[in-house]
Amino acid sequence: MEIASNKGVIADASTPAGRAGMSESEWREAIKFDSTDTGWVIMSIGMAIGAGIVFLPVQVGLMGLWVFLLSSVIGYPAMYLFQRLFINTLAESPECKDYPSVISGYLGKNWGILLGALYFVMLVIWMFVYSTAITNDSASYLHTFGVTEGLLSDSPFYGLVLICILVAISSRGEKLLFKISTGMVLTKLLVVAALGVSMVGMWHLYNVGSLPPLGLLVKNAIITLPFTLTSILFIQTLSPMVISYRSREKSIEVARHKALRAMNIAFGILFIIVFFYAVSFTLAMGHDEAVKAYEQNISALAIAAQFISGDGAAWVKVVSVILNIFAVMTAFFGVYLGFREATQGIVMNILRRKMPAEKINENLVQRGIMIFAILLAWSAIVLNAPVLSFTSICSPIFGLVGCLIPAWLVYKVPALHKYKGMSLYLIIVTGLLLCVSPFLAFS
């Protein structure tokens, strides 16, 4: 039923425009694609093309291509569905300033700080992953190309300088991040596509391997599931993205639509380009190279720069360097946004219990978070944290935060009951598989 107003005819309540209390013309104007939408698509793609894509070929090389294909059939559809659900549960929240406040709005302050802490731990692990990756891989490239005699990563201060620069850039605001990330992300997409095509000439059918026994295939597919998901995963940027849209848009429906649209565009681009690249790279890089990369704790691209020879080797090495460095840099930016938001939510939750909100110095809190982030990332670099092991360890937390908690909210909160359905069962099953994955990996 359409309702007349001084702004025009409000659309039927069953349509997005109607739910937003707008006419169709007002709705079209409100959801116009703008520079902010482009920025969040770029940030989402930048987040996804990070440790996932540069480390996935190592895991696939260790496990086999058949395992990867099975985990892809399970993982990619589930990933799309749970990222969509994650956005919807955030967008519906009465208060949307940070992840802990969203949970607090649904379940109360105690649940907010508990589940916010879980979300925080997931982001801490990814801070470890990217800070270690950018330090080790950049040092490896500089050494491989003869720029340095030894590995700069042997010095703890090299990593400290890198992290200080990245955190300083990340803390300057969304607009600067969008500008810096756009060129790097577009370059990454072109490089991923070009590298996938260039690898075709180096394919070897024996790298396909034989089909393993069913039991072993299923077990290894579950172990590989976290690596498959993280190859195009950008859940770390979804919370900052929804919060950004909620702060900009008066209508929750408009904010939800824009966030879902950005997610859909990013997912579609990533799936087409990254899946082809991952399969192509895996067919070109054998098991021995994967083992070597695992033992050296470096990415597949870093090891490719060492083993590729013949015509085009120089080009492959150069674009591998560009992809790897840009990948971990833009992914670090995305993770830092989520980390800052999660940390601020926990700190503010605690401080509001101790003092009135108006007495809290938010600028001081943000500076403290910057220093904390630098020290945290530097500690991972000094310890040379094993990246692939962290991905497995993070799996249960990711299963809880990305799948099981949103699913639980759907059953717990009446306003979210509309999201029940078969897709929710797939999300729950995927969450449970992610929870058991590391136990199978280390068994």
UniProtKB/Swiss-Prot annotation:
Regions that span the bilayer: 38-60, 65-87, 111-131, 150-170, 183-203, 215-235, 265-285, 319-339, 368-388, 390-410, 422-442
Keyword terms of this UniProt record: Amino-acid transport, Cell inner membrane, Cell membrane, Membrane, Transmembrane, Transmembrane helix, Transport, Virulence
GO cellular component: plasma membrane
Induction pattern: 40-fold induced under conditions that maximally induce expression of the locus of effacement (LEE) large pathogenicity island (PAI); part of the dlsT-yhaM operon. 3-fold induced by D-serine during mid to late exponential growth.
Record InterPro entries: Amino_acid_transport_2
Outcome of gene disruption: Decreased secretion of a number of substrates for the type III secretion system (T3SS) encoded in the locus of effacement (LEE) including Tir, EspA and EspD; at least EspD is also decreased intracellularly. Expression of 105 genes is altered; down-regulation of LEE PAI (including the T3SS) plus other genes as well as up-regulation of 21 genes. Decreased ability to form attachment/effacing lesions on HeLa cells; those which form attachments condense host actin less well (pedestal formation).
Topology term for the membrane: Multi-pass membrane protein
Biological process, per Gene Ontology: D-serine transmembrane transport; serine transport
Superkingdom to which the source organism belongs: Bacteria
Subcellular location field: Cell inner membrane
Protein family per UniProt: Belongs to the amino acid/polyamine transporter 2 family. SdaC/TdcC subfamily.
Annotated function: Transports both D- and L-serine; allows growth of strain CFT073 cells normally unable to transport D-serine on that substrate. Transport relies on the H(+) gradient and is not competed by L-threonine. May play a role in L-cysteine detoxification.
Name recorded for this polypeptide: Serine transporter
